[in-house]
Amino acid sequence: MRYKITVEYNGSNFSGWQKQQHSANSIQEKIENAIFNFSGEKVTLYCGGRTDAGVHALGQVAHFDMEKEFELYRIRNAINYHLKSIPIVVLNAEVVDDAFHARFSAKKRYYEYRIVNRYAPAALETGYVWQVFSPLDVNIMREAAKHLLGKHDLSSFRSKDCQAANPIRTIDDIDIIQNGNHIHIKISAISFLHNQVRIIVGTLVEFGKNRTNPQEMLNILNQCKRSAAGVTAPPFGLYLVKIDY
């Protein structure tokens, strides 16, 4: 039986989603252990979006196979019971066809990056936003972001450790929303390169901070090298919002 779960987590104190050889602090391993504790079965979780250390999720999706059958609410409640001291929560569980794969069946992924743009420290949101002290010109950021829409070679916006064979990606939408000193950057696409969202955000922040001509984004794209783009935004402002199937 194949089960699909939707998961919310605070990624602050984890090594990321993926289980690692020299660390027992991955989100994947915590959930796999919780499933074993209530079912007695060792399972392998496959996720829709592998988040890095410090990145949060509002709607991560994962699947796993079990021989035993359980009522869906019991799966959700049992996993949550064994995770009760950990900031990981299963929001929903459902049965899916054996052809379903959390990663390869995904149609679109949605990320959101949260910024607080003010000089006074963000006392209540530390660890959940990137605080940028210099004033940002959001209109310039929006104009620069338009050049990233569509299909491009995004070599300038991937980490040096990115293992993707093909740097071509299609960005469906970038929406920059300002509410007072809070700025949320929403990005959606079917797939992303490693650190792509964080590098895009870091680059847009530099545009907004330095009042750079938005047309300069085309030059960054065309150089196809990591050094052309801006800094990598810190992980703690990034949220995996949801995944469409």
From Swiss-Prot:
Active site: 52
Chain segments annotated as transmembrane: none
InterPro entries: PsdUridine_synth_cat_dom_sf, PsdUridine_synth_TruA, PsdUridine_synth_TruA_a/b_dom, PsdUridine_synth_TruA_C, TruA/RsuA/RluB/E/F_N
Annotated EC: 5.4.99.12
The keyword tRNA processing appears for this protein: yes
Reactions it catalyzes: uridine(38/39/40) in tRNA = pseudouridine(38/39/40) in tRNA
UniProt KW keywords: Isomerase, tRNA processing
SUPFAM superfamilies referenced in this protein's UniProt entry, alphabetically: Pseudouridine synthase
GO molecular function per UniProt: RNA binding; tRNA pseudouridine(38-40) synthase activity
Biological role: Formation of pseudouridine at positions 38, 39 and 40 in the anticodon stem and loop of transfer RNAs.
Similarity section: Belongs to the tRNA pseudouridine synthase TruA family.
Subunit structure, as described in the record: Homodimer.
Protein name: tRNA pseudouridine synthase A
High-level lineage: Bacteria, Pseudomonadati, Pseudomonadota, Alphaproteobacteria, Rickettsiales
